[in-house]
């Protein structure tokens, strides 16, 4: 048997010089005693603090590349004609490969070189990020109207009300789609699904191996702080992803193949598509660089010196013969595949893959019988469902609800929401360490944080903008006759059914899908100092024939986006107070040998019950609020207009539902912990008089038989 970290109460051994030379590939030769730690001169990589730093940077880069898709989800929808349900499914495919392997990799992590496995996974994540950009390079240039973007005057003319004989030729319509066009669409979408799956597979070893590695070799009192720092730095990844998305989406999607005459779109145009693919290249490079140090960390490293000194001081007064006998690994017979300790089941470390598959269902069921483990995981499932839906669709929600650009929405989220998440995680970790919170204290902190989060979520139902009037869609034709989608005023026009070039009547604040649907037959460009403004004139369907302005109507309540996001950020910070204490409830509730497996089971449930279904659930709910769909080759593509009031109620309502579930679970956790604490004190008070009486009978120099206090 090679050197291993023993149960609580044993001093960990340090590999000898021969083993150190081959560390990570071979175990220590059986029977050889390890030298004292000061006899070994460890390299700079034999430092758990350095590992915490490197792992924080890697998880930051990993979440940056996975979070970048969420920052550009609405842009990808417009570029490839996807519904919110499909884009939510695309985002959740990150978890498919991860879920299929997480438990097995977590268990067999005790046999492999964990840092190197983390490095290999990071390399796969970087390659998946590069694959994610491939659809951009194999697709045709983006067409934002029925004409080529290389001819701006033709672009303006294509949307005018013109007789059928003089109308410009349109691009392939819904009834004129070739099989090649549909096949190409399916191919590029399929590539993105494969890339997302590989992204999840590569991330399998990163978090569970890193958490268990830190908790194995860090001082017990430092572990909460280290994990708090790890999670806090990690959460900067999505924040950087949204900041990167804000920059990239200000660039036109085909920046690498811009036409000579430029384009007629501006960033405020609803047809604008930013360079979503460019951020994946940058994030993939960051992950590849962060993976390099992991190939130099050892398989095992000595515990921190404070841990060794602490154990030497307390071993003599806390380790009873009964405890040593209970924790001794020699108590397990060679044929046993599992053993029960402290309510959880530990799998023997010498199982084969087939044996592991056979014994895992029983281990899983017995693990879930532990009430604290089950309730904490269920509460984290609710929190993760809320976080997955919010992270995936909050940028799109802000765009639609407050009529702001995708770039500005990402900037606000990156500057407000994610810093608050970091603050919440750090404060939670510091409170656990400074207050020396035990299980009951951790449970109380989790419940308090979620109750406050739920309270500050109530005003979100009432902060938002109603949908502006759209002729023929949301406009009441009974109040204003002649403004339906195909009125008699535009019968002579040859308006494309699938056209989309919105214009706004400033006097009535009514929006039309195209200038043709407003009956406009001409256009003018007014040059200004900073930009040019396009007006469409001679509009037969507009009241008094007023000119209409190119672009959607501006929202009258866009200023509410900042108060809305401040409340969201405050709720996120309060919810993240529970992050570190809930993890400590799981890590401190299992044996050291069970930690990797317990974390693996935890993440398996989070992915199966939260990160996989939640984006699809939120996307489906968003799709039900759509009032006008774009069509592509006869199929429903991207949504162009939503019912904003219904969108707000359903999106925030889902968030409120998951927060309520988390509050209920944490309340049950606290109740169970208090009951267990009460029973333990009662048992201790009852057993103390019996022990004292037995000591008097046995004499001062004898110990009571079968004492397990």
Curated annotation (Swiss-Prot):
Changing residue 436 to Q: Decreased low-affinity transport of E1S; no change in high affinity transport of E1S. GO terms for molecular function: bile acid transmembrane transporter activity; organic anion transmembrane transporter activity; prostaglandin transmembrane transporter activity; sodium-independent organic anion transmembrane transporter activity; transmembrane transporter activity. Changing residue 272 to A: Decreased E1S transport; decreased cell surface expression. Strong decrease in cell surface expression. Changing residue 62 to A: Decreased E1S transport, no change in cell surface expression; no change in Km value and decreased Vmax value for E1S transport activity. Decreased taurocholate transport. Residues 70-88, 141-185, 256-273, 389-408, 461-564, 623-655 are extracellular. Keywords: Cell membrane, Disulfide bond, Glycoprotein, Ion transport, Membrane, Phosphoprotein, Transmembrane, Transmembrane helix, Transport. Changing residue 475 to Q: Increased high-affinity transport of E1S; decreased low-affinity transport of E1S. The record marks 607 as: Essential for E1S and PGE2 transport activity and may interact with these substrates. Changing residue 55 to Q: Decreased low- and high-affinity transport of E1S. Disulfide bonds join 489-520, 495-516, 504-541. It comes from the Eukaryota. One of its GO terms (biological process) is transport across blood-brain barrier. Changing residue 517 to Q: Decreased low-affinity transport of E1S; no change in high-affinity transport of E1S. The record marks 611 as: Essential for E1S transport activity and may interact with this substrate. The modification Phosphoserine is found at residues 34, 320. Changing residue 59 to N: Decreased E1S transport. Changing residue 219 to Q: Decreased low- and high-affinity transport of E1S. The modification Phosphothreonine is found at residue 318. InterPro entries: Kazal_dom (IPR002350), MFS_trans_sf (IPR036259), OATP (IPR004156). A conserved histidine residue in the third transmembrane domain (His-136) might play an essential role in the pH sensitivity of SLCO2B1/OATP2B1-mediated substrate transport. Transmembrane domain 1 (TM1) may be localized within the substrate binding pocket. Belongs to the organo anion transporter (TC 2.A.60) family. This is Solute carrier organic anion transporter family member 2B1. It comes from Homo sapiens. The gene is SLCO2B1.
